[in-house]
Design a protein with these regions (language model features):
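Basic/aromatic recognition patch in beta-strand/loop cores that engages polyanionic ligands
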Residues: 39, 46-78
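Generic structural signal for secondary-structure transition and capping sites
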Residues: 27, 42, 46-49, 89
Length: 97
């Protein structure tokens, strides 16, 4: 059985900012980005240990077609999505929670 995905408030903020940015760039691009994020959540949920570590217990998964990674931590009963990070930003932000 797959663990549930929980999304931190910071990750939700990251997601909304990215969707808003892409919607300004091109109509419908924000929806495409959100679809790719949801696909990546599904991959994380199915195989949480398949991704590489960024720091201690934090793993990351690359989002297809966009310059983003999702950082997460596999906990006992759930998978916590920590950040949805634009890879063009400061690398130190990856470790913020």
């Amino acid at each position: 059985m797959h663990k549930i995905i929980s999304i931190t408030p910071r990750a939700l903020e990251d997601l909304q900012q990215a969707i808003d940015h892409y919607n300004v760039q091109l109509q419908g691009l924000g929806i495409r980005f959100e679809d790719n994020i949801n696909d990546t959540f599904g991959k994380i949920q199915k195989m949480p240990k398949a991704a590489s570590f960024t720091h201690d217990t934090v793993r990351y998964k690359v989002v297809q077609d966009f310059p983003f990674i999702i950082t997460y931590e596999e906990l006992e009963t759930r998978i916590a999505i920590l950040r949805i990070f634009n890879t063009h930003q400061d690398d130190e932000k990856i470790f913020e929670r």
